[in-house]
């Protein structure tokens, strides 16, 4: 879409933060209004993360107005809320391309702009990186400032508290801003608290505070009395005791939608020494009533008509794999009260809404705490229950040691339902489920299953749930199932694949939901097609049979080739001294960028045409 200067006259004056800082303060509320409307107009036409950005418009304007970005370094946690930041930093006219192949990255990305200090996508990394950046800036000696913006969900993660604990110890000059959109602005976050915040952040208070500490530092009883008096005064009105205990100077809460008030507070805090903490209250979806009322639904949106206030409904076609999992979960829980389901803040995405309502006492959302989720599941298993950890492939990476140390070594029967395995599409490099087979396959006694369709997915979940000799995992993709008939649940024989088609010289060993594409290739090339089903343990007998009866083998998977299922097949053949040629087809050795799943599979040669071309070129 082209930028409409007449519709956004103030925003038209701002294509960089340098231009923003030339505007008079009085025009900033109007700029915020135009920025919010432009965000609505753009995202409704292109799709993308939506409600979070609406809530950070005033904060974004205030930060870039007060701080000398990009010289001063601004770090956004996760990045869902960073669309206004992109618009104000030279990417205004390209915002309609966000999350599209070749377009703007969905999150702050170092390779895209000098304003994007840290590439992000996963949560709770900002403060740790910010401390390192602040320490580097201090050693540089150019008075470069560091600011981290983190949400109320991301700050619950252990990594954020580990970082704050470290900051309290080494005391770098930095500002952490908590964007708290859990609730609307309440009465006690009004004029009085804003006035108090400006007083507490002002030079007079800070001078008195630090001066008093120096004067009385040698008199322990008076020092302690001073500390307690200060805590008592601030504790009456400031809910920041936890952050103060971690070593931060806490300011807030303040109204995150008062751009002029934010500017005053940020200017007061800009030159304070040591770690500072500013708590702002915002409303997710601010300025667009449907998003304010339902921020979860409007968190990430497809293209929609903003005048309707509704998102387009599903066509009612095939269910998603997440829905298949959710239905199986409810069905199984109704029969077994030992089932416990765990998610790290991904209830909707993992298909667990219905389960959470039907079985609230057996549903555990542990927040953004993947490490805790896995070890919590280990504890439930020790206690005699049957835990299921529903988690995205890209987020399970964050709990790898817990899978190893707390589950696998102890042979605990924890089932991992791994959603978003393989190419996920528009969220790009940070969210592709490219590595789970590689990092799980090397864990001793782990059972790993890759269904080729929704019926097999259900059977594998059932098999894993009833496997009691250690952990198991079922990995399935983002997107809809293929429409096969669902048969009664039964346990699959562990480590056994099945031949789907008999051919001649070539055998294709398929792992997972690329099966429809592999089937087209097998038909075209008159190849044998095998649904391997298990990545671990591999069906070694079937692999050796295929090697003995065919001139060449091809493995197919939507996982990194390095260390993946195909690598396992290679290892089996080498161990048995079988010199049959093998072509491994999978994800290449680079981070897969954004684009639709169809676009990326075609580009990577993982659709039927691409696979066939690769095989023919290899055989030539």
From Swiss-Prot:
CDD domains: TPP_DXS, TPP_PYR_DXS_TK_like. It catalyses: D-glyceraldehyde 3-phosphate + pyruvate + H(+) = 1-deoxy-D-xylulose 5-phosphate + CO2. Keywords: Isoprene biosynthesis, Magnesium, Metal-binding, Thiamine biosynthesis, Thiamine pyrophosphate, Transferase. Pathway: Metabolic intermediate biosynthesis; 1-deoxy-D-xylulose 5-phosphate biosynthesis; 1-deoxy-D-xylulose 5-phosphate from D-glyceraldehyde 3-phosphate and pyruvate: step 1/1. Thiamine diphosphate binds at residues 80, 121-123, 153-154, 181, 288, 370. Its cofactor is Mg(2+); thiamine diphosphate. It comes from the Bacteria. GO terms for cellular component: cytosol. GO terms for biological process: 1-deoxy-D-xylulose 5-phosphate biosynthetic process; isopentenyl diphosphate biosynthetic process, methylerythritol 4-phosphate pathway; isoprenoid biosynthetic process; pyridoxine biosynthetic process; terpenoid biosynthetic process; thiamine biosynthetic process; ubiquinone biosynthetic process. Mg(2+) binds at residues 152, 181. Optimum pH is 7.5-8.0. GO terms for molecular function: 1-deoxy-D-xylulose-5-phosphate synthase activity; magnesium ion binding; protein homodimerization activity; thiamine pyrophosphate binding. Binds 1 Mg(2+) ion per subunit. Binds 1 thiamine pyrophosphate per subunit. Its EC number is 2.2.1.7. Gene3D superfamilies: 3.40.50.920, 3.40.50.970. The keyword Iron does not apply. InterPro entries: Dxylulose-5-P_synthase, THDP-binding, Transketo_C/PFOR_II, Transketolase-like_Pyr-bd, Transketolase_BS, Transketolase_C, Transketolase_CS. Optimum temperature is 42-44 degrees Celsius. It is an enzyme of class 2 (transferase). Homodimer. Belongs to the transketolase family. DXPS subfamily. HAMAP family: DXP_synth. Catalyzes the acyloin condensation reaction between C atoms 2 and 3 of pyruvate and glyceraldehyde 3-phosphate to yield 1-deoxy-D-xylulose-5-phosphate (DXP). This is 1-deoxy-D-xylulose-5-phosphate synthase. It comes from Escherichia coli (strain K12). The lineage of its organism: Bacteria, Pseudomonadati, Pseudomonadota, Gammaproteobacteria, Enterobacterales. The gene is dxs.
